[in-house]
A protein has these predicted regions:
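Helical segment within the ABC ATPase nucleotide-binding domain
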Residues: 46-58
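Short, small-residue-biased leader/transition segments that mark boundaries at the very start
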Residues: 1-5
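Conserved H-loop
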Residues: 60-65
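Short, glycine/charged-rich "phosphate-handling" switch motifs in NTP-dependent
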Residues: 78, 90
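ABC-family nucleotide-binding domains
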Residues: 34, 41
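A short, proline-enriched helix->beta-strand linker immediately N-terminal to the Walker B motif
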Residues: 25-29, 35
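A short, surface-exposed alpha-helical micro-motif characterized by mixed small hydrophobic
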Residues: 72-74
Length: 106
C-alpha cells in the first residue's frame, strides 16, 4: 500500500526515474525501454539520458523504442527504422538525420 501511495504522489518524470532505477538495480544485461521520456519535463529527460548512458558505460545493452527522432539520434549508437513491421533501414546515429529517419519510415 505504501509503494502505491508513494508512487502516485510523484510527478510523471519522477515516476519514470523511479522505474528506471528499479530496472537498473536488477543488474540485467539488456534493458528494453519504450518511450522512456514520454510526458516528462526537460530536466527529468536529461536525468533519464544520463542513466541510459551509465548503463552503456557499464557494458549493458540498451534498446530504446521511441518516436522522437532527435532523442534517438542523441542517445543511440545505431538507429533501426521500422516500416510496416519490417526493418527499413539501419543507420549510424552519429551520421543520420531526422530527415533520413523520416524518409525510411514513411
Amino acid at each position: 500500500p505504501y509503494t502505491t501511495l508513494f508512487r502516485s504522489a510523484l510527478s510523471g518524470g519522477n515516476q519514470q526515474k523511479v522505474m528506471l532505477s528499479r530496472w537498473i538495480m536488477t543488474e540485467a544485461d539488456v534493458f528494453l525501454l519504450e518511450e522512456p521520456t514520454r510526458g516528462i519535463d526537460v530536466g527529468a529527460k536529461t536525468e533519464v539520458y544520463e542513466a541510459i548512458g551509465d548503463c552503456v558505460k557499464n557494458q549493458k545493452g540498451v534498446v530504446v523504442v521511441s518516436s522522437e527522432e532527435e532523442e534517438v539520434l542523441g542517445i543511440c549508437d545505431r538507429v533501426i527504422v521500422m516500416k510496416n513491421g519490417c526493418i527499413a533501414a539501419i543507420l549510424n546515429a552519429k551520421a543520420a538525420t531526422t530527415e533520413e529517419i523520416k524518409h525510411y519510415a514513411v
